[in-house]
């Protein structure tokens, strides 16, 4: 094993004081090792400035001799004078530079698998309710009767389509639909049981209590409740629990139990869950030191590839997705360590440039902006942008030749597609007109805006020098290779970049350029270019290592991406300063950094959770669109369905998404098939709409309208009301058909002939129990409204309750007044609660444990970074 002597590459001219300061700094750094490791592992990144190294200066000065302390103080004084221009870093200190937009990062990391929520109750639409019974004279009896009523009767008053209620109900079912049910977890004690038996959930227990305490309950039913308990079949790992459910609720819960998404979990599944490239990477040592029980279960994540093709014509949405991926990626790219001391490197560069008082201005620019913060920032930006396929734009100054020469390295190792076209053309044109063409004495390139060829493509055809033309050819053809790995489309770098060989090609071209005569340029110009090339060529070994390090980190993190990496130019770009590229090239040390296993697993889990949630929300949206279509609500609800879909993905600012993309998204969603479970659930609702309408206090099955007033009748459930329980003797017209055709002539003719008409179809009604308001409304007949407006949807039939509970009841009794109404609500009787028909036995596994984080069972470690190898089985960084 090769060992490296710390500080071996520092220059010979660094004096003893600097060495002593370095040793003291290393001691200090070791003392704060735990603090640094905490900062590295923390999710919140921060910029570490140089002020921390001065905290214990006083203690260090006391330990040294008087003479050494004087020299040390002089060094510190000199450093303070240059602090504005130069940042000096301690060796082995990490320099995080990126402060993520924590809101987006938190939204991404907070997306958890839905199965994590524990089911404590069965799914129910109905609940049994006691209602009073009224005598013929309107007085309430002491007896009660049990009926099935809706738990959430959420239909609002007024002009509201009942079909919207069913769409909202379906949406509620989809939201509450469990991925698995374990009845043992929700079972509660039956208080009335003789032998401490259990029933399936707390609502069943409360219903049993209420029935048991009801004076009218038969003795046989009470005895049955006392016998209610679970039945265990241990040999089959099965348990049966008694439950009290409406038949429709029983159908729902039985379906959920039969179609659970849990699957058996074993070590092989966990092993295969880890991305294959990480399993096969010799730098990572993975162990599973636990045998799972036979009852272990997991829910397979839904990782279908993007069925909406968001990269195609969804510029705003795609920009948001790539931005969030970029922020996530930057948080997991490792920080560079042991960068070359900025001060020492600038001193060495100054020596190489032979800077003197009379040096031309251009060469002093070479040193501006070089610091380790920029180098680390550049490293993270390049890898994160490639992982998220974010387009980058380049910022540079044409007169800073060092930036342009560094840009030549950048264009060599990063595919052209990663840069916005305008920025790429500007950078290439600057390199051609500043370095390449002057070297050969060629005239400046006059580039026409909009030319399909880039400046490098034009230059490749015109330059005769083989090495330079060969390098230009490589850059012009440097594209990602699209490779499908484990069913995911990956954007892979060229092999010459991965192994670093391309840097030799770049250096050959640079050396050829530096040997040219620059015939049309002054000597100073030629010297500046040559010295800039010399600075970069002196670091050939480090640049090869840097390129290999960049490629390795990119490909290792790419293994954790689960969605196809589609390459499309993004609306916004990530800015990259070429001076930061210079910093990276000049300051890269010889310390290898690779992602920690914990970071990789975290990155993989966040990607899986977002991808799975994305697919589940697509399935929900497709199901709701299909339901809206079948309920004839397609036009009315479409935009809100798409908006809800985007909101549930967490990362989108829905208000800012352009309408054209909303409608394009709607069209794509319409073309997708409905998932089987969601379709079956909708069919269950559709088949039982009549029962659900009956159980609602706000939905009627029709309305009877007449020209003359109709007398109120006694109803057993409400007293005196304008409710009709059957339509015998009335002419019937279908409400849906009437609204579709808009032909009201038939109604008008019947009413003019004094024949009441029954309009049949689900519609809402407003409850009003005041007799005074009834008298006030008698003048405005519904008939007048229909003839005038010809709109049935303005019809609001009113349910009037006049009984012994009403404040106005005695008014009726005293004045012998017979209340009447021009409308009657047709309302079918809700289903009566029958204990025997509502008793169901539900069956599930006796026990199983669902694990949501499969990677928690894997213990992982890495080899010593210095020994980490790349794909070619050679050390990532060889320049020791």
Swiss-Prot record:
Q: List all Basic and acidic residues biased stretches.
A: 19-30
An example GO CC term for this entry is:
T=2 icosahedral viral capsid
Which residues are in coiled coils?
Answer: none
Q: Where is this region: Disordered?
A: 1-45
| Stretches for region Hydrophobic | 394-414, 422-442
Q: What is its main location?
A: virion
**The keyword Transcription regulation appears for this protein:** no
Could you tell me the keywords of this UniProt record?
Capsid protein, Inner capsid protein, Repeat, RNA-binding, T=2 icosahedral capsid protein, Ubl conjugation, Virion
Record site feature (Interaction with the intermediate capsid protein VP6), residues: 220, 224, 228, 839, 841
Localisation:
Virion
Pfam hit, one: Rota_VP2
Changes after translation? Sumoylated with SUMO1 and SUMO2. Sumoylation of viral proteins seems to have a positive role on viral replication.
Q: Provide a Gene Ontology MF annotation, just one.
A: RNA binding
Q: May I ask which residue range the UniProt record assigns to the signal sequence?
A: none
Domain free text: The N-terminus binds RNA. It is necessary for encapsidation of VP1 and VP3. The N-termini of 10 VP2 molecules form a cylindrical hub underneath each 5-fold axis of the inner capsid.
Describe the protein's quaternary organization and the partners it interacts with: Homodecamer; each decamer is made up of two conformers of VP2, called VP2A and VP2B. Interacts with a VP1-VP3 complex. Interacts with the intermediate capsid protein VP6. Interacts with NSP5. Interacts (via N-terminus) with NSP2.
- Similarity field: Belongs to the rotavirus VP2 family.
What function is annotated for this protein?
Inner capsid protein that self-assembles to form an icosahedral capsid with a T=2 symmetry, which consists of 120 copies of VP2, with channels at each of its five-fold vertices. This capsid constitutes the innermost concentric layer of the viral mature particle. It encapsidates the polymerase VP1, the capping enzyme VP3 and the genomic dsRNA, thereby defining the core.
Q: What is this protein called?
A: Inner capsid protein VP2
Organism the protein comes from: Rotavirus A (isolate RVA/Human/United Kingdom/A64/1987/G10P11[14])
